[in-house]
Structures are given as C-alpha cells and as structure tokens.
C-alpha cells in the first residue's frame, strides 16, 4: 500500500481537493486502486453544522455523511461513492475515544491525547 499526502496547512481554497482528485484519476488510469481520505482538524463532528460562509456548503454523501466539498470532487472525478470512511474530523476522533472511555474500554486508564487519540488516528 502506498500513500500520497497533500497538505495545505491553514490555506483554504487553493485547489488541494481538485488537485488530489486529479492525481487520483491519473493513478486510476494507470491501474491503481485509489481511496481518497480527507482529514479535517476542526472539532466539529462533520461539516454539516459549519457556517457555509466560513467553510463552504457541505457535501451530502450517499451514507448520510455531511462532508467537505472536496469529497464531492473526489466522487465526481473518480466516479466512486464517498462516505464516512473517506472524511474524518478531529471532532469525530475525539468523540470515538470519549465514547470508548465511557464504555470502560480503556479499563480505567487515564485517557490522553498520546497515546489514545494518536492510536485512534492510526
């Protein structure tokens, strides 16, 4: 398995999503299987409650995920359905870890960013 990371820090609207989708299409046409993933550092669970003036309109996936507009670009360019497996927010990661802590899955450990959050990301 090979990974390509495209990062833009805090710069928004410069075409990272379209560039990523285009690179994916080139790889697909060369016979590679492509699975785009988008990770957002905001603490919202999904993009559905973010002010569209601030972040753009959310893209509604077939599975009900309210994702970033880039997920729509991935769907259109790559001709693949995207969903919750393709769009992850830091809020969703924290939510998963907190739910596990509430179910006592950490056996009473102190739940911390390292290692619990980082393990969830990996």
Q: Where are the regions that the model predicts?
A:
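Flexible phosphate-sensing "switch/lid" loops adjacent to ATP/NTP-binding sites
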Residues: 1-122
């Amino acid at each position: 398995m090979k990974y390509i990371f495209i990062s833009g820090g805090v710069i928004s609207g410069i075409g990272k999503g379209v560039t990523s989708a285009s690179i994916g299409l080139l790889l697909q046409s060369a016979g590679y299987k492509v699975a785009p993933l988008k990770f957002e550092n905001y603490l919202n669970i999904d993009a559905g409650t973010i002010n569209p003036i601030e972040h753009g309109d959310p893209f509604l996936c077939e599975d009900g995920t309210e994702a970033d507009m880039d997920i729509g670009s991935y769907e259109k360019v790559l001709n693949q359905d995207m969903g919750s497996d393709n769009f992850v927010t830091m809020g969703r990661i924290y939510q998963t870890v907190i739910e596990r802590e509430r179910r006592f899955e950490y056996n009473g450990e102190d739940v911390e960013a390292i290692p619990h959050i980082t393990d969830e990301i990996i």
